[in-house]
Curated annotation (Swiss-Prot):
Any one GO cellular component localisation term in the record: microtubule associated complex
Domain remark in the UniProt entry: Dimerization mediated by the LisH domain may be required to activate dynein.
Coiled coil (UniProt feature): 74-96
Family assignment from sequence similarity: Belongs to the WD repeat LIS1/nudF family.
One Pfam family here: WD40
Entry's Gene Ontology BP terms: cell division; establishment of mitotic spindle orientation; microtubule sliding
Protein name in the entry: Nuclear distribution protein PAC1-1
Assembly mode: Self-associates. Interacts with NDL1 and dynein.
WD repeat intervals: 120-161, 163-203, 207-247, 250-289, 294-354, 355-394, 399-439, 441-460
Location of the protein in the cell: Cytoplasm, Cytoskeleton; Cytoplasm, Cytoskeleton, Spindle pole
Chief localisation class: cytoplasm
InterPro entries hit by this protein: Dynein_regulator_LIS1, G-protein_beta_WD-40_rep, LIS1_N, LisH, PAC1-like_LisH-like_dom, WD40/YVTN_repeat-like_dom_sf, WD40_repeat_CS, WD40_repeat_dom_sf
Organism, as annotated: Sordaria macrospora (strain ATCC MYA-333 / DSM 997 / K(L3346) / K-hell)
Stretches assigned to the LisH domain: 9-41
């Protein structure tokens, strides 16, 4: 006892024990202890006994409270570690060997930590887009600016100013040999910027009556750009003239996102009206070819599957032979109902992917066709294996410190790249549906943007 307690502490413990035994109506035991410790009536009188009465119980309950206080966060931490261990074990069980993954772009998936965290925006990041060839990345923010980064070096190259409200989306594309950057904003406008002329604003496209939510160059068209707006419409623009050539009406509420098919014939849109619509834009007056109904809340994002994914998605849909076209045969949508839905061209939901704990903000198909990637307000990036019925095989927890609002995959590099940086991929995906061909090379690079003001680069 003397090795643990000082003489004074030991004496106080003895007195507290005697007081406890006396109060517990155990006088014989108390007397035996007093005799053993040589604590006579002159030393341990009634006043002293009163002083130490209840002291032992107080000390004991304090220790119990301290143990609970100390153990509760420890138990939580253990449960969290067990959960992470379960996720990692699941990834290990479902993954190919790491060495093969690193060497095979078709099997590559992002992993933490990111290669770069790009910081400069002063308000939440809303969008990101890769240059089709060069190592340039554009990011848009609620701070009204667009920033151009070198994603390989992790360095800021320039800040573009021109919009007077939040920048909501950006995309690279345009005429062959003359890649442009398009941006759209809550200021109701779309702006075109020339990367070859220090990102000079070469044209502003007015016409929408409310915030412009999304912009995408249409593959194969060269000059055509599609936009989605809170005014409930989509518009198709000729970027060489600045004229709106078609207006698509059909949604009952805010149109949130838009994605053109790989052959440029179809456009998929999502809306606050809980629906997504597939439009045939080859006709003079486009109308929805099919309306996708099933989500229980606002549909925030969409993606059209590359032909490389058709075999996996066809099997999931129970189709023996995958489609041979490069049109919008399969699609994915993400919603505030926390789910992702996979659809076929007939408008049938072939699978619902559940796992996110908050709004699904962004979707992108792996160019190799095996995976679908998603980001969410739950701060995670998830990878869904289309060869395993859409099973979630990888989760990057805390991919950001706040809501993850956007995700883009760097477009594949085509071997016959022109000197001006056009590779036939106006919207970051190969022309004519050739998602992965002998003449293209997958770039294993992903960018995400968040409310935490950071853009993150995940790369092999």
């Amino acid at each position: 006892m003397s090795q643990i307690l000082t003489s004074r502490q030991a004496d106080e413990l003895h007195r507290a024990l005697i007081a406890y035994l006396t109060a517990a109506n155990l006088p014989n035991t108390a007397a035996a202890l007093r005799e053993e410790l040589n604590l006579g009536e002159d030393v341990f009188d009634p006043a002293t006994a009163k002083k130490y009465e209840g002291l032992l119980e107080k000390k004991w309950t304090s220790v119990v409270r301290l143990q609970k206080k100390s153990l509760t966060p420890l138990v939580t931490q253990i449960m969290d570690l067990e959960s992470r261990n379960h996720i990692l074990q699941s990834e290990l069980d479902n993954a190919t060997p790491t060495s093969r993954q690193n060497k095979d772009p078709v099997a590559w998936l992002p992993r933490a930590p990111p290669r770069h965290t790009l910081q400069s925006h002063r308000d939440p990041i809303t969008c990101v887009a890769f240059h089709p060839v060069f190592s340039s990345l554009a990011s848009g923010s609620e701070d009204q600016t667009i920033k151009i980064w070198d994603w390989e070096l992790g360095e800021l190259e320039r800040t573009i100013k021109g919009h007077t409200k939040a920048v909501l989306d950006v995309d690279y594309g345009g005429p062959r040999g003359n890649t442009l950057l398009a941006s759209c904003s809550s200021d109701l406008t779309i702006k075109l910027w020339d990367p070859l002329d220090s990102y000079k604003n070469i044209r502003t496209l007015p016409g929408h009556d409310h915030s412009v939510s999304a912009v995408r160059f249409i593959p194969g068209s060269g000059n055509l750009l599609v936009s989605a707006s809170r005014d409930k419409t989509l518009r198709i623009w000729d970027v060489s003239t600045g004229y709106c050539v078609k207006t698509l009406r059909g949604h009952a509420e805010w149109v949130r996102d838009v994605c053109p098919s790989f052959d440029g014939k179809y456009i998929l849109s999502t809306s606050d009206d809980y629906t997504s619509r597939l439009w045939d834009v080859t006709v003079t007056n486009p109308e929805p070819r099919v309306t996708l109904i099933g989500h229980e809340h606002v549909v925030l994002c969409c993606a059209i599957a590359p032909p490389a994914a058709y075999q996996n998605l066809a099997a999931m849909a129970g189709i023996k032979k995958p489609p041979a076209t490069s049109s919008a045969e399969f699609m994915a949508t993400g919603s505030r109902d926390k789910s992702i839905r996979l659809w076929d061209a007939r408008g049938t939901c072939i699978k619902t992917l559940a796992g996110h704990d908050n709004w699904v903000r962004g979707l992108v198909f792996h160019p190799g066709g095996k995976y679908l990637l998603s980001v969410s307000d739950d701060k995670t990036l998830r990878c869904w294996d289309l060869t395993q019925e859409g099973k979630c095989v990888k989760t990057i927890g805390d991919a950001h410190g706040h809501f993850v609002q956007c995700i883009r995959w760097a477009p594949s590099v085509i071997k016959d790249v022109s000197v001006n940086g056009d590779n036939g991929e106006p919207n970051g995906t190969p022309k004519k549906g050739a998602a992965v061909t002998p003449d293209s090379q997958i770039r294993c690079v992903i960018a995400t943007g968040s409310v935490d003001l950071n853009v993150r680069i995940f790369a092999n």
